[in-house]
């Protein structure tokens, strides 16, 4: 099925690309989320008329994401207190929701889906490097310090 992308889609293309995808992927994911429209003659003409508007909107979203990434970097680090044993191992773990809540409490709104933990959840005390994907092209790094609760 031919579709016109209205947004950048990972491993597929960027705004304005006409790509061939499976019908189910287009019908169940791309079209309902507003990331693509079927490539009919009417839609192609409509898209070409609105291309500049859509590109400007995409640039605004990217600029907002870069501003959020800059705010995250300005924080420097976030401290999370958790119960821990004598050897520095946590009772439980610190996951994406805990990190997102701590960063939001520090003043930058982050959804738990934007937190990237390449080594899995945090299970030890100390400093951990955590990355945030605030946009498909924009990443931010932050130190998360896990301390023992008193």
UniProtKB/Swiss-Prot annotation:
Keywords: Ribonucleoprotein, Ribosomal protein, RNA-binding, rRNA-binding. One of its GO terms (molecular function) is structural constituent of ribosome. InterPro entries: Ribosomal_bL9, Ribosomal_bL9/RNase_H1_N, Ribosomal_bL9_bac/chp, Ribosomal_bL9_C, Ribosomal_bL9_C_sf, Ribosomal_bL9_N, Ribosomal_bL9_N_sf. One of its GO terms (cellular component) is ribonucleoprotein complex. It comes from the Bacteria. One of its GO terms (biological process) is translation. Belongs to the bacterial ribosomal protein bL9 family. Binds to the 23S rRNA. PANTHER family: 50S RIBOSOMAL PROTEIN L9. This is Large ribosomal subunit protein bL9. It comes from Pectobacterium carotovorum subsp. carotovorum (strain PC1).
């Amino acid at each position: 099925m031919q579709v016109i992308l209205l947004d950048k889609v990972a491993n597929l293309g960027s705004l304005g690309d006409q790509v061939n995808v499976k019908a189910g992927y287009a019908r169940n994911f791309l079209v309902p989320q507003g990331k693509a429209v079927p490539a009919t003659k009417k839609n192609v003409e409509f898209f070409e008329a609105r291309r500049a508007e859509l590109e400007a909107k995409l640039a605004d979203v990217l600029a907002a994401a870069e501003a959020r990434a800059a705010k995250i970097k300005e924080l420097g680090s976030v401290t999370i207190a958790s119960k821990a044993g004598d050897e520095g191992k946590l009772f439980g773990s610190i996951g994406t929701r805990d990190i997102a809540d701590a960063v939001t409490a520090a003043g930058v709104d982050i959804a738990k889906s934007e937190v990237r933990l390449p080594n899995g959840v945090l299970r030890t005390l100390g400093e951990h490097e955590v990355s945030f994907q605030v946009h498909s092209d924009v990443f931010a790094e932050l130190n998360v310090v896990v301390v023992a609760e008193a």
